[in-house]
Amino acid sequence: AARRAAEVEKVAADINAKGGRAIAVPTDVTNSQALEALAQAAVDDFGKLTILVNNAGGSRAMGPLTELSAKDWQDCVDLNITAVWAATIAAVKRMTEGGAIVNISSLVARGPIPGSGHYGAAKAAVNSLTETFARELAPNIRVNAIMPGYIPTEVMMAALGVADESGLPALAKQLAIPMGTFGKPQDIGAAVVYLCSPASGWVTGQMLPVTGGH
């Protein structure tokens, strides 16, 4: 699920072509009705819902908190906090056989982020939601979060002012990532698989950093 239909349709087609099974559901996570429809689509097509990954997030607004507009603040809250809460509520109502929820937080939740304080505060709130949902939904539903480090996604590159991939090597050196490279989406995907699998059956309420040691 994502806002851009063409992108999710391509991902679903790739999964189906490789022998998996997927459906594409264009979804704006800031719309609670769309989240309800998404959760129900999973049940209708697959027969049940057992896993939710809250992966939508970000903020293109940058600047000191004292200069942030009320709209930019609210947009960040709607996308990064309210959507996580609303999607979890929509999924939990349908997780009749138990399940696992993974929230994608961020390393910025750990401390002050001048110029992006609203986003850091939102991700800190995601961690708090993760811990509380984990307590409230145990033992049938496990809830954990992943805190990614620097991964050159479209949103991160825009936030750091990198125009294209040619600027990444210099930025990686500047950031001094211990593992020596930026992360990849697959690094986060592997952590999600762990947190949704029986291998993490006694893990809940945890924030897992996947940061290359940063």
Language-model features: where?
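The beta1-alpha1 cofactor-binding region of Rossmann-like NAD(H)/NADP(H)-dependent oxidoreductases
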Residues: A5, P26-L38, A70, Q186-D187
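Substrate-binding pocket helix/loop in short-chain dehydrogenase/reductase
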Residues: G63-L65, D72-Q74, K173
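Active-site helix of classical SDR
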Residues: T88, A122, T130
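Alpha-helical segment proximal to the catalytic Tyr-Lys
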Residues: K93, A134-P139, G201
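Residue(s) in the substrate-gating loop at a strand-loop-helix junction
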Residues: S106
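Short, flexible catalytic-loop segment of classical short-chain dehydrogenase/reductase
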Residues: R110, M147-A158
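C-terminal helical subdomain
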Residues: A145, L168-V203, V210-G212
